[in-house]
Amino acid sequence: MKNNAQLLMPREKMLKFGISALTDVELLALFLRTGTRGKDVLTLAKEMLENFGSLYGLLTSEYEQFSGVHGIGVAKFAQLKGIAELARRYYNVRMREESPLLSPEMTREFLQSQLTGEEREIFMVIFLDSQHRVITHSRIFSGTLNHVEVHPREIIREAIKINASALILAHNHPSGCAEPSKADKLITERIIKSCQFMDLRVLDHIVIGRGEYVSFAERGWI
């Protein structure tokens, strides 16, 4: 009963002020629902965030790290992994229904949901039609911890196949630092030049780090 009483406060706060009013601890407590022996759910949520440093650290943790927290088992690990997957699928659907140019923040959130936590560099392309609506997106290349081989002709071939008119490029830096490298800038220039011959526009290249991003368009590089 104590756990349920403790959980009532975040619920009441959510109903009165909206879900965004909850702290990370309160939001995590809502999902955990119950604490462990001798520890209420709010205390447990607070300790978990302290152990992992942030929600990002928690949601991208492996089971070996997660099970090191006393009293936490596979059920709660599965709950939190389910939350992360729900968010990823939500942005997947939303991307198909909204124009990335009308909601650049949503586009970044989508890319973060797709690429955050990956241990290798992944190069993604969002393919858009002439109205800048999403046709599809693809993890078109994958590489190592700090490098991914990108071939512009493969991107163009896929764009032509699905009749795309514009592209948004994206890749992650598993190191966590989103600052583009010289190689990132060079491959972006190569892709843009190759696309120009086929009347394809590259609208942006977004690099995803740990809790940060860099947009080539916002920097004025595209």
UniProtKB/Swiss-Prot annotation:
List of residues binding Zn(2+): H171, H173, D184
Signal peptide location: none
Ranges for domain MPN: 100-222
One Pfam entry name: UPF0758_N
Metal-binding among keywords: yes
GO terms, biological process: proteolysis
UniProt keyword terms in alphabetical order: Hydrolase, Metal-binding, Metalloprotease, Protease, Zinc
InterPro entries in the cross-refs: MPN, RadC_JAB, RuvA_2-like, UPF0758, UPF0758_CS, UPF0758_N, UPF0758_YicR
Motif JAMM motif positions after renumbering to this chain: 171-184
CDD domains, per the entry: MPN_DUF2466
Claim: Protease is one of the keywords in the record: yes
Disulfide cross-links: none
One Gene Ontology MF term: metal ion binding
Entry similarity comment: Belongs to the UPF0758 family. YicR subfamily.
Name assigned to this protein: UPF0758 protein YicR
Organism from which the protein derives: Shigella dysenteriae serotype 1 (strain Sd197)
